[in-house]
UniProtKB/Swiss-Prot annotation:
Belongs to the urease beta subunit family. This is Urease subunit beta. One of its GO terms (molecular function) is urease activity. Keywords: Cytoplasm, Hydrolase. GO terms for cellular component: urease complex. SUPFAM superfamilies: Urease, beta-subunit. The gene is ureB. Its EC number is 3.5.1.5. HAMAP family: Urease_beta. NCBIfam families: PRK13203.1, urease_beta.
Length: 106
């Protein structure tokens, strides 16, 4: 066996499916602004930058279905479909743009 490298991660062979079994909502999103907009993996998508045009009611309580710590960047004039998944756990949204600041299911 080869010596371990500090901080090295040893993983099992195969693929890891993120958010397996979670319901997915696909929305079309367009950046109508003149600057790029970046949205992180755990940002409450309904509260994303106002320059992004999409169905905000359908995005309520959801986040991007991408790996944790990553983001999607929308260049000016860019349009694309994104997959969203519901927040799990306590489903309480605090902060972001201050539009909810409490439980999603109240």
């Amino acid at each position: 066996m080869a010596p371990l490298i500090p901080g090295e991660l040893l993983t099992e062979p195969g693929e890891l499916e993120l958010n397996a079994g979670r319901p997915v909502t696909t929305l079309s999103v367009s950046n109508s602004g003149d600057r790029p907009v970046q949205v992180g993996s755990h940002f409450h998508f309904a509260e994303a930058n106002a320059a992004l045009q999409f169905d905000r009611a359908a995005a309520r309580g959801q986040r991007l279905d991408i790996p944790a710590g990553t983001a999607i960047r929308f260049e000016p004039g860019d349009s694309r479909d994104v997959n969203l998944i519901p927040f799990a756990g306590a489903r309480c949204v605090i902060g972001f743009n201050g539009q909810i600041n409490g439980p999603l299911d109240a």
